[in-house]
């Protein structure tokens, strides 16, 4: 609902940043999220990227790269793709603490709303803030809400998006 996005979520983000000195720290996540992320921090990852590779949209995933290109060019990412963008950073970094540091860095550096309380709400939602535990428990994610590029392709018309934001798109 548009009212939720404009009022409820905006005010919740501001309230969290004003009332919690550690709003931008890993330890500010809900206990369940910290536990599940810590339980899976050492899970094997198929891909690991460093901050430079993320910054330059140099991953194996065309959808993720397109989202990063949009972020760098326009200072924003389509809302649904922004969620996927963050979830993949969690999946492709050595542990959730590094993922969070990359998320904050990329968001603050490139997003028009970087450093805004709403932006921090979005970044921390990726790791479980303002969400609930989800099942089944999965490697890397644990009980954190899971998203894939494949499932995104079924919910979002990617062809024009990839034509605009990908390098050498074949979609």
Report the location of each language-model feature.
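Structured ligand/cofactor/substrate-binding pocket environments in proteins
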Residues: 3-14, 72-121
């Amino acid at each position: 609902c548009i009212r939720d996005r404009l009022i409820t979520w905006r005010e919740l983000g501001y309230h969290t940043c004003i009332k919690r000195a550690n709003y931008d720290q890993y330890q500010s996540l809900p206990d369940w999220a910290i536990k599940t992320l810590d339980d899976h921090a050492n899970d094997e990852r198929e891909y690991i990227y460093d901050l430079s590779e993320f910054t330059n949209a140099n991953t194996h995933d065309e959808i993720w790269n397109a989202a990063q290109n949009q972020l760098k060019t326009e200072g924003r990412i389509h809302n649904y793709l922004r969620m996927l963008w963050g979830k993949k950073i969690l999946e492709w970094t050595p542990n959730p603490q590094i993922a969070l540091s990359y998320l904050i860095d990329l968001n603050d550096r490139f997003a028009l709303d970087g450093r805004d309380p709403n932006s921090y709400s979005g970044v921390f939602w990726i790791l479980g803030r303002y969400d609930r535990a989800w099942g089944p428990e999965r490697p890397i994610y644990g009980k954190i809400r899971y998203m894939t590029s494949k499932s995104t392709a079924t919910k979002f018309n990617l062809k024009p998006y990839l034509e605009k934001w990908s390098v050498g798109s074949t979609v």
